[in-house]
Design a protein with these regions (language model features):
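Compact, glycine-rich, soluble single-domain proteins
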Residues: 2-138
Length: 138
């Protein structure tokens, strides 16, 4: 909804590694933070990301409503193994009234974590199905 932009959402921060690449992440581990995600942020440097953390494994989807830039999305299982990768997902810039027109991206298997990083990260750092998520601190 349009009032989402007006609400301040505080994201805890943490550090993770993917393929030994360290990233500072904003952590979305509550319903309000997961709903807000990276909406309305102007950019995301290559050494930062957003880590969605879920209480149990499931088929969690993402969409790009109110995003300002394209993203790479990586779904991980509870052991940190890559389940699904979606590269260069474009923003969905449509009026909020027809937000249902934004496509959702669903993994091929159940995940516990989803990492959003700026588009090009997966290619730059050779992230593949063999890559591993290591949580340093969240």
């Amino acid at each position: 909804p349009s009032e989402i932009k007006l609400q301040q959402v505080e994201f805890p921060r943490g550090v993770i590694k993917v393929n030994d690449i360290p990233l500072e992440v904003q952590i979305a581990d509550t319903e309000p933070t997961r709903v807000r995600g990276l909406m309305f942020q102007d950019e995301l440097p290559f050494d930062q990301g957003m880590l969605f953390v879920f209480p149990e494994s499931g088929l969690y989807s993402l969409w790009m409503l109110n995003m300002q830039f394209p993203l790479d999305m990586i779904w991980f299982d509870s052991d940190g193994a890559v389940i699904h990768i979606k590269k260069n997902v474009p923003p969905c810039v449509i009026p909020i009234e027809i937000a249902a027109g934004c496509p959702s991206f669903v993994p091929t298997g159940e995940a516990t974590y989803i990492l959003e990083v700026t588009s090009g990260f997966v290619e730059r750092y050779n992230i593949t199905k063999d890559s591993i998520l290591e949580i340093i601190s969240i």
